[in-house]
Each structure stands twice: as C-alpha cells, then as structure tokens.
Amino acid sequence: MTLEWFYATFVEMWSHTFMVRGFAVTILAASVCALLSCWLVLVGWSLMGDALSHAVVPGIVLAYIVGLPFSVGAFIAAIVCVALIAVVRNGSGLKEDTVMGVVFTTMLALGLVLISVFPSHIHLQHVIFGDLLGITQADLWQVVVLAPLAAVIVIVKRKDLTLFAFDPIHASAIGLSTKRLSALLLICLAMTVVVAMQAVGAILIVALLIIPGATAFC
C-alpha cells in the first residue's frame, strides 16, 4: 500500500463534482431516514415507508411528462398513496397492512406501465436502485431543502410525536390531535422518501427507514 494508491483511492475522487454531490446526498438521506426511523418503528409504520417508496414511481414519470421536477411528482404521488390507503381502509374494513400492499403494488404497476407507454430517458434501473453518480445540481438543491425541512419538523415536534407513538389515547386526552400528528408524520415520511429516492432508489429506501429504528429499539 503506497501513498500514491491511498491518494488515488481516497483523495483524488473528491476532485470530481459528481462524487461530492453523491456523497452529500447520501449523508443527508441517511441522516433524515435514521432520524425518522425511530418513530416509524414505534408507531408500526415500517411497511408504510416501503409502500411510499414504490408508490412514487408513477409520480416521477408523470413529472417528467409535464416538465416538473422529479421531487414534485414523487411528493404528490406519495401524498396520493397515503390518501388512497386511508380511503380504502376506511371504506373496506380491511387491515392496514393489506390495504398498503394493494395500493403500493397498484401504483408501482401503474408507474411501470407509464414508463413503457411514454419512452423517455428515465431508466427503470435508476428508479429502482437510484442514480447516485448521476445527481445533478438541481437534484442536490432539492435534497438540501427537503432533508433539513423534514428533520426540523420532526425535531420540533419530537415530544408530541413520541407521546403519539407510545400512547395515542393519552395524547388525545391531553388535547393533542392524533390525526394531525399522524398526517404530519406521513408528510415528513413523504419528504424523506423523495430525498432517499435520489440516492438509493425505490427498493433500498425501506432499509434506511427500518434498520436504524429497529436497531435502536433492540
């Protein structure tokens, strides 16, 4: 192991802009996912993160078709997914995990159909596994805005969210709106999914959203 090897392996790569962008997005995505993961595990919403990560695929495709930033389409698709889960769950009487499975697989299938019908530069592999080295300056700014925003919201409301996670009945009894806290947590989850999509894609988001909280819980 020589000094030249060390420089070429660990130092020279930072001279490339795409490496710096990829590293920055990875750090931001991993940090906000780990922060949110604790509440997701406590509330029992681990599958919700998986559902949203798959459900954003049609939003990404539609955003490209109409010329919007991918993050806008992904965020809207995530909110639509949450709304559909609530509507189907309340209207059918099915358990929440069953409804999640139905909704997110349907939206993922819709996204794959849209990719096939509207050929574009969107590669399915990049949607599923991310495109870390292809992150643009615009993508970086989207992550820089959304990741701290989600983190700040969770930190500011951490006491209310923790009480909601441990004892929603007590939270409601002392005047907290459990519906609003639930909606707030879902919005933060949607923003976090959009951030992580840039780095790891739809498949691996669930690992960033579950493993940190599960590790802390143990």
Question: Over which residues does each language-model region extend?
Answer:
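Membrane-helix/interface signature in polytopic inner-membrane proteins
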Residues: V152-L185
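Membrane-interfacial amphipathic/re-entrant helices at transmembrane-helix boundaries
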Residues: M1-S31
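Transmembrane alpha-helical segments in multi-pass inner-membrane proteins
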Residues: I203-C218
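Short loop segments and helix-boundary regions at transmembrane helix junctions
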Residues: C38-S120, F217-C218
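Hydrophobic alpha-helical transmembrane segments
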Residues: F23-L28, S71-I76, G101-V102, L140-V145, ...
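Generic alpha-helical transmembrane segments of integral inner-membrane proteins
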Residues: I27, S31-L35, I76-L84, L110, ...
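Membrane-interface helix termini and inter-helical loops of multi-pass transporters
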Residues: E4-H16, H121-I135
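Mid-bilayer segments of alpha-helical transmembrane spans in multi-pass integral membrane proteins
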Residues: A83, V87, T105-S120, I135-V144, ...
